[in-house]
Amino acid sequence: MKEIPVESLEPGMKFTAPLYMDEENIIVPEQAPVKAKDIERLKKWKLVVVHTEGEMINPESEEAEPGGLQGLIKKAFSSPAQKEVTKLYIRYSQKIRDFFRDIDQRNAPDSLEIKDFIDKVLELIARHKDDVIQYILYGKHGESDEAENALNATILSILIGQECNLLSHKIHQLAASALLRDSGMLRIPAKIRDKKGELTPDELREIKTHPVHSYRIITKEIGFSEDVGIPAMQHQERWDGKGYPKNIRGSDISLHARIISIADAFEAMVSERPHRSAMTGNKAMRTMLGDNG
C-alpha cells in the first residue's frame, strides 16, 4: 500500500480506497472526505503516515455531482458486496424485530428457529466480513433500534469469539446469548423501559432485573441450555464486581458474558442514540481501552 504523510492530508480530501492507520484499522472509508478531526486524531496519536491502495480523487471531477453527505455515503457503499450486506442487514434486523414481537406476546420462537437465523448471520460474516464491519461502523445513519443493536452486538460477539478461536458450537451459543441478551427488557413495563427522563431508584432497580428475565426467556421459553442463558444473565456484570444483577466479579463471569459485554459496549458507542451522536470505531475502541471499569 502507498504511504500518505499525515502532514499532507487536508480536510475534504477523498481517496478511491480506504485510508488505513495500520494494516487493519481504517480511519477514513473509500470516497468519504477526510475530516479535520480525523487529521487531529492522527496527529494526537503521533502517526506520521497513513496507508491506502487507492488514489486521491480530483475534486474537479466531482464538482458536477450532487448529493451532499448522503450522496457520499451512498457512493461509499455502492459496491455489489456492500449492496448485498445492506440488503441482508435490513432483512435480518426485521427478523429480529419479529422475534422480539413474538417474545413480547409470550409466543417466543423455538431454539431451532434462532439457530437457523444465526447460521445465516455466520454465512454473511464468512462471505463479507470486512464489508459487514464497514457497515456497522459507517453504513448506518440515524438512531438504531433494539433489533439493530442486537444484530450489531451479535455480529461483533461472533467476530470476537472467532478471534478467540472458540469452537463452532461455542460460537453458536455465544451468538444466541448476544442476540437475546436484552430480550428481558420486554418483561419490564413499557412506561419504565421507554421513559425519556431520569429513572427513579425503584425504576432503575426494575431495569436491572432485565438480565434475569432474559435468562428465563432463553432457557424456559425458547428452550436453550444454561450455556446460552447464563452469559445473557451475566452480560451486565463487571470485572470489579460493580455490575448487576448479582455483583459477581472477575473470572466468575463467564467468558461468553465478557465477550458480549465488550461487544455491547462497543456497539453502543458506534450506534447513534437519542442522547448523543455515534462515535467513530477508533474513538470507541480507545474509549473502551481507557475505561478501567
What are these model-derived regions, one by one?
Residues M1-E113:
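Membrane-cytosol interface segments
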Residues P66-K208, Y215-D227:
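Acidic/His-rich, divalent-metal-binding segments that scaffold phosphate/diphosphate chemistry
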Residues H210, V270, P274, G293:
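Active-site neighborhoods and metal-handling regions in enzymes and metal-associated proteins
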Residues A178, I218-E221, S225-A257, H275-R276, ...:
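Histidine/acidic-rich helix-loop-helix segments that form or flank divalent-metal centers
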Residues I188-P189, G241, S271:
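Active-site-flanking alpha-helical
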Residues R258-S271:
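Conserved beta-strand-loop-short alpha-helix elements that form
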